[in-house]
Curated annotation (Swiss-Prot):
The keyword S-adenosyl-L-methionine does not apply. Residues 602-642 are annotated as: Disordered. The modification Phosphothreonine is found at T199. Keywords: ATP-binding, Chaperone, Nucleotide-binding, Phosphoprotein, Stress response. It comes from the Bacteria. Residues 621-642 have a biased composition (Basic and acidic residues). Residues 604-620 have a biased composition (Low complexity). This is Chaperone protein DnaK. The keyword Chaperone applies. Induction: By stress conditions e.g. heat shock. One of its GO terms (molecular function) is unfolded protein binding. SUPFAM superfamilies: Actin-like ATPase domain (SSF53067), Heat shock protein 70kD (HSP70), C-terminal subdomain (SSF100934), Heat shock protein 70kD (HSP70), peptide-binding domain (SSF100920).
Length: 642
């Protein structure tokens, strides 16, 4: 059985890890970095760029560079948070036929799981390069507060990337695993405060020793799946835009190129202000008008940044309060606070957390890597390589069905330990009702329409009977991934109907299979592109070396040879500009053939000169013998040293 890798599929950055010889190893990517930007770009020549290479060209290709797509995964286009995002990103967010939020790049509409799959493929390749063997299985992390649609969409992304997703695990739980594995035995309760690039989670986790096993039990979780570092960046971008408008009268909001430069600069300034008291944002030639180019230069202090984002930091405290209340624990009873996610490096965030929980957070957990490390540990548990760990996670939101009067009737309350199964008997609302619609909901509101609709299905052929008589047993079954399976049974006839909740949107199996095939086709295209690039490089190198050889040879090359070589060089240069690898190979061969006689001539000449040069070199030492002075020295022994 191959290795099961752990992947932290982040909004801003992703990370891949593996358990090796009992130790967790974070794997460096091809660029030598331990995290990879979760950015995918579609270049004009059809190449798909992922990670740092995509980030580098974002300024010149803003409409086709997709970032923070995790915030759209499993979301409907009409949702408020999606509508808000449309105004903030330079790429297009469009409405799919099924009502989901999709993205558009290079004129092609794509589902968010397809984009996330490109990042996962990069993570998969990173692990394969390190291990030297194919990787097909993974544990992927999601925010604890992700709903069923978002979890399902993440699993779909894994499938499209060619991965068998063995488990979807909550990010704070993964971080607690990474933290708790090497801690001393005994019970302790920890808070994991996870403020990442696009999402916020907080979990109360009890780490206990039960029958020699490390038991990680999530007592409660809460969060906000649309609050993270990207929002902090936006506050800074808005401030810079306003300052520039005050100074120059020009609005940069409608200039995608300028906004992309501002995004990069804002992120850099935010990071710098975690360690410095002030920084300069200096962007020359940010735009131009009739009077000439305009430059942006704004000094920002840490205090200014903190005033811009203070309310965002405060928004994270209420979920902490709710999580403690749901867990039935007082803040003073928390043993350790673990900070996860790059945004937790901000001093204001650290202070807010310390003030609320009454203790400083631990500094020995890497906020960028802990989640991937925990996922790798869970992978090793599933593979049987780690035996003494038991993970008890929870369902983050209440699950129920719509009943008479548009009411949501809960079946599984939030923070119920998973996997779990719960059944409840319902009946008909009308006399002789022949079918019932089971409308599955997720959320905390009493009014059904105010909750997230996960899907509907019908149980038909109910025998005629007065209202309230038929016995319809509805069963909710949540698996270890937090994904819901729902069944309904007419107790009188034994007739059943069941579904794995796929939401009233989401991707169908056919769509996923098509995307998997597309991804495989892309892999073939990528291979061809690499081969073409190698052929072009070989062609360019041969043109350069041949021209140099002809120049060095001077009049030793005949006019006919020169003409033939130049014609072959021009033909190869033309072929290199094209996309036909076979044509490049043919022209390389042709140039090699016509330049071979000259190369042989040069080689023969060098060989003829070589012995002569060698003889001279050997003669020189002989000539110098008369001048050699023998060194005078005494051997110093033992205590004679001076």
């Amino acid at each position: 059985m191959g290795k099961i890798i752990g992947i932290d599929l982040g909004t801003t950055n992703s990370c891949v890890s593996i358990l090796e010889n009992g130790n967790v190893k974070v794997i460096e990517n091809a660029e030598g970095a331990r995290t990879t930007p979760s950015i995918v770009a579609y270049a004009n020549d059809g190449e798909i760029l992922v990670g740092q290479s995509a980030k580098r060209q974002a300024v010149t290709n803003p409409h086709n560079t997709l970032f923070a797509v995790k915030r759209l995964i499993g979301r409907r286009f009409e949702e408020d948070v999606v509508q808000k995002d449309i105004k903030l990103v330079p790429y297009k967010i469009v409405k799919a036929n099924n009502g989901d939020a999709w993205v558009e790049a290079s004129g092609k509409e794509m589902a968010p799981p397809q984009i996330s799959a490109e990042v996962l493929k990069k993570m998969k390749k990173t692990a394969e390069d390190y291990l030297g063997e194919p990787v097909t299985e993974a544990v992927i992390t999601v925010p604890a507060y992700f709903n069923d649609s978002q979890r399902q969409a993440t699993k779909d992304a894994g499938r499209i990337a060619g991965l068998d997703v063995k488990r979807i695990i909550n990010e704070p739980t993964a971080a607690a695993l990474a933290y708790g594995m090497d801690k001393a035995k005994g019970d302790h309760t920890v808070i994991v405060y996870d403020l990442g690039g696009g999402t916020f989670d907080v979990s109360v986790i009890e780490i206990a020793e039960v029958d020699g096993e490390h038991q990680f039990e999530v007592l409660a979780t809460n969060g906000d799946t649309f609050l993270g570092g990207e929002d902090f960046d936006m506050r800074l971008i808005d401030y810079l835009v306003d300052e520039f408008k005050k100074e120059s009268g020009m609005d940069l909001k409608n200039d995608p190129l300028a906004l992309q430069r501002l995004k990069e600069a804002a992120e850099k300034a935010k990071i710098e202000l975690s360690s410095a008291q002030s920084t300069d944002v200096n962007l020359p030639y940010i735009t131009a008008d009739a009077t000439g180019p305009k430059h942006l230069n704004v000094k920002i202090s840490r205090a200014k940044l903190e005033s811009l984002v203070e309310d965002l930091v405060n928004r994270t405290i209420e979920p902490c309060r709710i999580a403690l209340k749901d867990a039935g624990i007082d803040a003073s009873k928390i043993d350790d606070v673990i900070l996860v996610g790059g945004q937790t490096r901000m001093p204001l965030v650290q202070k807010a957390v310390a003030d609320f929980f009454g203790k400083e957070a631990r500094k020995d957990v890497n906020p960028d890597e802990a989640v991937a490390m925990g996922a790798a540990i869970q992978g090793a548990v599933l593979a049987g390589d780690v035996k003494d760990v038991l993970l008890l996670d929870v369902s983050p939101l209440t699950l129920g069905i719509e009943t008479m009067g548009g009411v949501m009737t809960p079946l599984i309350e939030k923070n119920t330990t998973i996997p779990t199964k719960k059944s409840q008997v319902f009946s008909t609302a009308d006399d002789n009702q022949g079918a019932v619609t089971i409308h599955v909901l997720q959320g905390e509101r009493k009014q059904a329409s105010q909750n997230k609709s996960l899907g509907k299905f019908d149980l038909a052929d109910i025998p005629p009977a007065p209202r309230g008589v038929p016995q319809i047993e509805v069963t909710f079954d949540i698996d270890a991934n937090g994904i819901l399976h729902v069944g309904a049974k007419d107790k009188a006839t034994g007739k059943t109907q069941s579904i794995v909740i796929k939401a009233n949107s989401g991707l169908s199996d056919e769509e996923i299979e098509k995307m998997v095939r597309d991804a495989e086709a892309n892999a073939e295209e990528d291979r061809k592109f690499e081969e073409l690039a190698a052929a072009r490089n070989q062609g360019d190198a041969l043109v350069h070396s041949t021209r140099k050889m002809v120049a060095d040879a001077g009049d030793k090359v005949t006019a006919e040879e020169k003409t033939a070589i130049e014609a072959a060089v021009v033909a190869l240069e033309a072929a290199v500009k094209g996309d036909d690898k076979a044509a490049i190979d043919a022209k390389v061969e042709e140039l090699s053939k016509v330049s071979a006689p000259v190369a042989q001539k040069m080689y023969a000449e060098q060989s003829a000169e070589q012995p002569q040069g060698g003889a001279q070199q050997q003669a020189e030492p002989e000539a110098k013998h008369d001048d050699v002075v023998d060194a005078e020295f005494e051997e110093v022994k033992g205590d004679d040293k001076k």
